[in-house]
């Protein structure tokens, strides 16, 4: 698949990568229909976020179609059009239960395009799908 990845400060590239796969029962694989580039992505490319590793696919927002779901994804099905949140959340930890999703204690928060591969690609793996995706309105056009 095609993906736009960070290389090093001042450098990013469009490249070919392997399509992501389900690695946790709460994951979903989304075929990206629309994605965004925002100031945060530009800060990453500039080198302002040193924790972003070389070859990380950028992007943390998008709209897509679910192609595959893990066994413990209950709120979505294959074929659903979804909005991908910029914040991933487990929905179960202390902070998630209080609605403070950015502080998820179980590997959530701002991770897409930051700590894991993001949405500026043909496909993305979204962790904690039940809490990190939203059903798109049925009248939303591609």
What spans do the regions from the language model cover?
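Cytochrome P450 core scaffold surrounding the K-helix E-X-X-R motif
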Residues: 40-46
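Short Gly/Pro-enriched turn/cap motifs at secondary-structure boundaries
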Residues: 7, 19-20, 53-59, 111-117, ...
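Short glycine/threonine/proline-enriched tight-turn/helix- or strand-capping micro-motif at secondary-structure
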Residues: 11-19
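Residue-level recognition of beta-strand termini and adjacent short loop/turns
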Residues: 8-10, 24
